[in-house]
UniProtKB/Swiss-Prot annotation:
Source species: Oryza sativa subsp. japonica
Enzymatic reactions: ATP + H2O = ADP + phosphate + H(+)
Alphabetized PROSITE patterns for the sequence: MCM_1 (PS00847), MCM_2 (PS50051)
Family: Belongs to the MCM family.
Alphabetized InterPro entries for the sequence: MCM, MCM5, MCM5_C, MCM_CS, MCM_dom, MCM_lid, MCM_N, MCM_OB
Protein name: DNA replication licensing factor MCM5
Gene for this chain: MCM5
Length: 729
């Protein structure tokens, strides 16, 4: 411990240069003073491609932080850049000291030239690093990267509250009352507190005991510190593997700049901190984390980080967009192994490209993402479409309705085991921000869980007010959902209301709703069987063509990404006028249908559906990289809307019309028997009620029709998955 007693100057130099400089490795050819001088020269004298001084100007304007590109440092001094990469913890403090001194000299120079008073110093300057190097995989970072600069990409799933981290701790001796200040290691490291006091006792004075120090919080120096949890991007996780997480530590001006769900590219120092002392062998086991020294958010919510397209790619994309069959070609790439369903494929293509987001003058945001619901019989390739979109969309998260809770879809509040504080952890809708959420078995979700995504689908935000945390998270995502009808298969003898067990509030949020039926037709069954047999028979041969298929998927993914980043179409005047007339016409037809049938459609046609057609038109224009949506795009959007949502709303509407007098009389008799059998508030099994009325000579179809009509009049209700009937007042 004698080296500790020689003073703060020795300790400071030792902490920053344990392997070099004076008293260190004699082979080191870059000392503390020469490194400081070179950093100053770099900040003062580095010139950009246009001859300006980017870092000098950045220091004058920002005053508290400056972002330095490692490539610029490479061009200025390769040795200095290499030291930053290999020993960032030693050289970054020097870099920040140099920045503070350069800023002070620049400000005094400006004050001398202008005659104005020099503004007071705002504190130390923080250095942010940036790099164009490729990111490392989270799985490849090991002990070889310890204390070196690393660059990784991922998605933020949790953010802690801001804490105060001590940079220098003031210690007070309990015996002699002497004061000592010791530095703290940056990041999650602590302070090294000496065990003995520096005070030399006078003759006859009692010496200070061991461990006499107590911390004085009021006299210590602090900075803001926040911890983040970074998870691998979903598209980077190998099949069957759990995503890896990495703890991040951000401080000072990087605090409170990131919310859960944000996609990040992080540059930081791979470090370790002490594991819990309660664990066995904790002294030798350290937990890894990254001390962030630079981060870059995704450039666009709809793109996976800053996308760099080559000139050849851009030329190829623009040439493809000019082809007259571009729309048909794109749709043929959607689910190539799935036979038929051409309109569903076109709708999914529109979902992948999306419409244009808009921000109104009053601050209201209008979503550009398209939601599609596939409702229909089993074995109609609904889940296959969802799996294809998960692989093709630039950002996608796949989940199943039965295994998804409200917190798992939106966000949850987790209590940290060590600090016992609460922090947010984003769910599927937050993690897929800027992409697509694929929800299978949508009808199997609990109603209270399904309600949780209402706000996420329309306002594209998720509001949290739990455990003292009140915040709003972004959820700018499209939803592709697949569901089965109530009875498992779609019953053509029932109305849409009786086949679709979803509330109007959730149905109105879907732009397109397709009822996918397994139609039993000889010719079609033969063609489908032939296609499936070919797919299975060519499975072995197709393995050699997998490369071509994957290249096609990658090309489509890149093209979708390029269109979403570069093209933001708007409606032309003619298209807007045509849209207005057609929407009024559809509303008139729906009013007429409601008047004829005496009840509203199961799937409403509201202003949301008008906005859906606008988004579809913009998406069709985006596929062709055109900046204006024309009447042709509106025409195709209306055709898709008619074959999906409008047909679903009209399905089964003639079922209860034109009943013969005999059947109408039998239905009335069945209603009377049901009311006589069931008192108000009583309940009975549907199967038992039908069997009892059968024994009285009534046909089962007549009894079911009577129950259906009574349910529509709200005289009875179904419970326990429609197995139990309850008589209402």
């Amino acid at each position: 411990m004698s080296g500790w007693d020689e003073g703060a100057v020795f300790y400071s130099d030792q902490a920053q240069f344990p392997r070099g400089g004076p008293g260190g490795d004699p082979s080191a050819d870059l000392t503390r003073h020469s490194a400081l001088r070179k950093f100053k020269e770099f900040l003062r004298g580095f010139t950009g491609p246009t001859g300006d001084f980017p870092y000098r100007e950045s220091l004058v304007h920002n005053r508290d932080h400056v972002t330095v590109a490692i490539e610029d440092l490479d061009a200025f001094d390769a040795e200095l850049s290499d030291k930053i990469r290999k020993s960032p913890a030693d050289y970054l403090p020097l870099f920040e000291t140099a920045a503070s001194e350069v800023l002070a000299s620049l400000r005094s120079k400006v004050a001398g030239e202008t005659g104005e008073m020099e503004e007071p110093a705002t504190g130390d300057v923080q250095i942010f690093l940036s790099s164009k190097e490729n990111c490392l995989s989270m799985r490849s970072i090991g002990a070889d990267y310890m204390s070196k600069l690393v660059k990784i990409a991922g998605i933020t799933i949790a953010a802690s509250r801001v804490k105060a981290k001590a940079t220098h701790v003031t210690l007070l001796c309990k015996n002699c009352r002497s004061v000592k200040t010791v530095p703290c290691r940056p990041g999650l490291g602590g302070a090294i507190v000496p065990r003995s006091c520096d005070h030399v006792p006078q003759p006859g004075e009692e010496p200070c005991p061991l461990d006499p120090w107590i911390a004085v919080p009021d006299k210590s120096k602090y900075v803001d510190l926040q911890t983040l949890k970074l998870q691998e991007n979903p598209e980077d996780v190998p099949t069957g593997e759990l995503p890896r997480n990495m703890l991040l530590s951000v401080d000072r001006h990087l605090v409170q700049t990131i919310v859960p769900g944000t996609r990040l590219t992080v540059i930081g120092i791979y470090s370790v901190y002490q594991a819990s002392a309660n664990q066995k062998g904790a002294v030798g086991v350290k937990q890894p984390y990254i001390r962030v020294v630079g981060l870059e958010q995704s450039r666009d919510a709809n793109s996976n980080g800053p996308s760099n397209f080559t000139l050849d790619e851009e030329m190829e994309f623009k040439e493809f967009a000019q082809r007259p069959d571009a729309y048909v070609k794109i749709c043929s790439m959607i689910g190539p192994s799935i036979y038929g369903h051409s309109d569903v494929k076109k709708a999914i293509a529109c979902l992948l490209f999306g419409g244009s987001k808009k921000r109104l003058p009053d601050g209201v945001r209008l979503r550009g993402d398209i939601h599609v619901l596939l409702l229909g019989d089993p074995s109609t390739a609904k889940s296959q479409f969802l799996k294809f979109v998960e692989k093709t969309a630039p950002i996608a998260v796949y989940t199943s309705g039965k295994g998804s809770s409200a917190a798992g879809l939106t966000a949850s509040v987790i209590r940290d085991g060590s600090s016992r504080e609460f922090y947010l952890e984003g769910g599927a809708m937050v993690l897929a921000d800027g992409g697509v959420v694929c929800i299978d078995e949508f009808d199997k979700m609990r109603p209270e869980d399904r309600v949780a995504i209402h706000e996420a689908m329309e306002q594209q935000t998720i509001s949290i007010a739990k455990a003292g945390i009140t915040t709003v998270l972004n959820s700018r995502t499209s939803v592709l959902a697949a569901a089965n009808p109530i009875a498992g298969r779609y019953d053509d003898l029932k109305t849409a209301q009786d086949n679709i067990d979803l509330q109007t509030t959730i149905l109105s949020r879907f732009d397109l709703i397709f009822i996918v039926k397994d139609v039993r037709m000889y010719d079609q069954d033969k063609r489908i069987a032939s296609h499936i047999i070919k797919v299975h028979a060519s499975g072995a041969a197709a393995s050699s063509k997998n490369t071509d298929a994957s290249e096609g998927e990658n090309w489509l993914k890149r093209y979708i990404e390029y269109c979403r980043v570069t093209c933001k179409p708007r409606l032309s005047e003619k298209a807007a006028e045509m849209l207005q007339n057609k929407y009024v016409e559809i509303r008139q037809k729906m009013r007429q249908q409601a008047h004829e049938t005496g009840r509203a459609a199961a799937i409403p046609i509201t202003v949301r559906q008008l906005e859906a057609i606008i988004r579809l038109s913009e998406s069709l224009a985006k596929m062709r990289l055109t900046s204006v949506a024309t009447p042709e795009h509106v025409e195709e959007a209306f055709r898709l809307f008619n074959v999906s949502t409008v047909d679903a709303a009209r399905s089964g509407i003639n079922e209860h019309l034109n009943l013969s007098p005999d059947i109408a009389n039998e239905i009335k008799q069945a209603e009377a028997q049901i009311k006589r059998r069931m008192g108000i508030g009583s309940h009975i099994s549907e199967r038992r009620l039908i069997d009892e009325l059968n024994r009285m000579g009534m046909n089962e179809s007549i009894v079911r029709r009577a129950l259906l009509i009574m349910h529509q009049r709200d005289e009875v209700e179904y419970k326990r998955e429609r197995h139990v009937i309850v008589r209402k007042a």
